[in-house]
Regions:
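Long, low-complexity, intrinsically disordered polar/charged segments
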Residues: 74-112, 175, 227-228, 232
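A general structural signal for short secondary-structure junctions and capping/turn motifs
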Residues: 13-14, 33-35, 130-131, 168-172, ...
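An acidic- and aromatic-residue-enriched active-site/binding cleft used to recognize and process polar
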Residues: 26, 88, 143-144, 183
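Conserved, well-folded catalytic cores of nucleic-acid-processing
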Residues: 72-76, 94, 130, 170, ...
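Short, well-ordered beta-strand core segments
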Residues: 41-43, 138, 178-180
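Conserved P-loop
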Residues: 2-96
């Protein structure tokens, strides 16, 4: 097909079915439950953990399974509007194992001059970019890890998705939203402490987060209705929106 230059600008869309979203956080906080509420979601089940949820899922326990599932989704003969990869960590491990097997090596570093790392990164980038370009929403679930960051003036701890750096950098470049699932504690007037699960959506030195849609406040409850409501409203003015949603 011939390539032509555009004559009109694109129109931003608020539909979650067009967004690529990374959700990460500690175990059992509700990442998969939250993802299951995205429009017409189908899970690529890369690790156990969905037995307590009523969802559409296809087991993808090898990279060949994963690629086959991608091909089925890309064909378009289905009712789904959102692809959920649960978890991205296991998907990357399968990708690495597949590439290593093809080149008859045990570890990515076994090939000279960094070729093993490059082969894995290229395959990872190729497949994720293809998925993100499909006309569906894409939700990527990852675990969280605390990493020590050293600077010239000191060091600090940053919470980030538990992917290797080479895999994480590919993902961060693709997504529209990076949602960090966290908890906050509140103490009432009687001294009773309660814990609330929240989403952090804006960049911060101590955790990875981001929202290029401009529709989310800094923090909001880990509640899909509260999250989805933001996509039925105008974009958020981040200069005036505070943490009022978390009370």
């Amino acid at each position: 097909m011939a390539i032509a230059l555009p004559t009109t600008k694109t129109t931003p869309t608020a539909s979650l079915s067009t967004k690529t979203t990374l959700i990460y956080g500690p175990p059992k906080i509700g990442k998969s439950t939250f993802a299951s509420m995205f429009p017409h979601a189908v899970f690529f089940e890369c690790e156990p953990g969905l037995n307590e949820l009523s969802v559409f899922k296809t087991p993808t326990h090898t990279w060949e399974d994963f690629l086959a599932a991608c091909k089925l989704v890309a064909a378009g003969d289905h009712p789904f509007k959102t692809i959920v990869i649960d978890t991205l960590d296991n998907a990357f491990m399968m990708c690495s194992a597949n590439v290593c097997a093809k080149h008859q090596i045990e570890y990515e570093g076994d090939l000279p001059h960094g070729k093993g790392w490059a082969f894995v990164k290229n395959e990872w980038h190729r497949v994720l970019t293809r998925l993100a370009s499909l006309p569906y929403g894409l939700v990527l679930i990852s675990h969280a890890v605390d990493k020590r960051i050293e600077t010239r003036t000191g060091e600090y701890t940053k919470t980030q998705p538990s992917l290797p750096d080479r895999a994480r950098h590919v993902v961060l470049g693709l997504v529209d939203m990076i949602l960090f699932c966290d908890t906050v504690s509140h103490k009432d007037e009687r001294g009773q402490t309660s814990v609330q699960r929240i989403i952090r959506s804006k960049p911060h030195p101590t955790y990875e987060a981001g929202d290029r849609t401009g529709r989310l406040p800094d923090t909001l409850p880990l509640d899909f209705a509260a999250f989805a409501k933001r996509f039925d409203e105008p974009a958020v003015d981040v200069a005036t929106t505070s943490k009022k949603e978390v009370s």
